Amino acid sequence: MKKEGILNSELAKIADDLGHTDQVCIGDLGLPVPSGVKKIDLALTRGKPTFQEVLDIYLENILVEKIYLADEIKENNPEQLKILLTKLSADVEVVFVSHETLKLMNHDVKAVVRTGENTPYSNIILQSGVAL
């Protein structure tokens, strides 16, 4: 049994298998998951686990070179955005796209991780970097 790192076996497998430029999405309760894309449903109740809790686990365990966020988060959930941006290293590229574009991008991610988050536009696509 692992005693640290990502303990959830499905989350760990996705993180372990990410190659350079591979992507994983962390989403809120309402984010649709495209047919054929792996869904890891962590939602226990409304609000648990939070988007930030799940994001923290991935940021601690994978090298992220770029993130994608819905542009709508700026106006509709600025506090979530503010907290999120403070967690990123300075070299992470931040790209804002429309929420519709973000949903379309989910067709190409390795997995969508569903949290219990119930605040608007709490969705992110993490793009894996390379440690060379």
Swiss-Prot record:
Principal location listed in the UniProt entry: cytoplasm
UniProt cross-references to PANTHER family, sorted A to Z: D-RIBOSE PYRANASE (PTHR37831:SF1)
NCBIfam families xref list: PRK11797.1 (NF008761)
Catalytic activity: beta-D-ribopyranose = beta-D-ribofuranose
Role this protein plays: Catalyzes the interconversion of beta-pyran and beta-furan forms of D-ribose.
GO cellular component: cytosol
The organism's taxonomic lineage, starting at the top: Bacteria, Bacillati, Bacillota, Bacilli, Lactobacillales
Gene name, Swiss-Prot/TrEMBL: rbsD
Keyword annotations of the record: Carbohydrate metabolism, Cytoplasm, Isomerase
EC numbers, comma separated: 5.4.99.62
Name listed for the protein in its UniProt record: D-ribose pyranase
GO biological process, one term: D-ribose catabolic process
Pathway terms, separated by semicolons: Carbohydrate metabolism; D-ribose degradation; D-ribose 5-phosphate from beta-D-ribopyranose: step 1/2
Domain of life: Bacteria
Subunit structure: Homodecamer.
Active-site annotation: 20
Origin species: Lactococcus lactis subsp. cremoris (strain MG1363)
Gene Ontology MF term list: D-ribose pyranase activity; intramolecular lyase activity; monosaccharide binding
Family that this chain belongs to: Belongs to the RbsD / FucU family. RbsD subfamily.
Entry coiled-coil feature ranges: none
Localization annotation: Cytoplasm
